[in-house]
């Protein structure tokens, strides 16, 4: 049973990495980053359930990761929205704002 959860978690994480490498849109990159964090959450919960059913350490870490991911998504989308207002594009290859 643990192997099924770990395979799904690894699959989610790999899809997130692939999307992060391939995507040219910042919004899509943020979505892929969230997918990677969901794979990590599934991994933590699966190991916590498999190793010790009585303690909820893995679930607590997963809740913290979900909270951090929500803050990361809000800040990331605010940055993307600000860049879109200034540049009219959210493509990563056209992002040269930090160049002087």
From Swiss-Prot:
Keyword line: Chloroplast, Membrane, NAD, NADP, Plastid, Plastoquinone, Quinone, Thylakoid, Translocase, Transmembrane, Transmembrane helix, Transport
GO molecular function annotation: oxidoreductase activity, acting on NAD(P)H, quinone or similar compound as acceptor; quinone binding
One family name in Pfam for this protein: Oxidored_q2
EC number: 7.1.1.-
InterPro entries linked: NADH_UbQ_OxRdtase_chain4L/K, NUOK/Mnh_C1-like
Keyword check for tRNA-binding: no
Compartments in which it is found: Plastid, Chloroplast thylakoid membrane
Signal peptide: none
Membrane topology: Multi-pass membrane protein
CC annotations in GO: chloroplast thylakoid membrane; NADH dehydrogenase complex
Positions of transmembrane segments: 2-22, 29-49, 60-80
Keyword Methyltransferase carried by entry: no
Catalytically driven reaction(s): a plastoquinone + NADH + (n+1) H(+)(in) = a plastoquinol + NAD(+) + n H(+)(out); a plastoquinone + NADPH + (n+1) H(+)(in) = a plastoquinol + NADP(+) + n H(+)(out)
Gene Ontology biological process terms from the UniProt entry: ATP synthesis coupled electron transport; photosynthesis, light reaction
Assembly, per entry: NDH is composed of at least 16 different subunits, 5 of which are encoded in the nucleus.
PANTHER family: NADH-UBIQUINONE OXIDOREDUCTASE CHAIN 4L (PTHR11434:SF16), NADH-UBIQUINONE OXIDOREDUCTASE SUBUNIT ND4L (PTHR11434)
Family: Belongs to the complex I subunit 4L family.
Entry function: NDH shuttles electrons from NAD(P)H:plastoquinone, via FMN and iron-sulfur (Fe-S) centers, to quinones in the photosynthetic chain and possibly in a chloroplast respiratory chain. The immediate electron acceptor for the enzyme in this species is believed to be plastoquinone. Couples the redox reaction to proton translocation, and thus conserves the redox energy in a proton gradient.
Full protein name: NAD(P)H-quinone oxidoreductase subunit 4L, chloroplastic
Organism annotation: Zygnema circumcarinatum (Green alga)
Gene designation per UniProt: ndhE
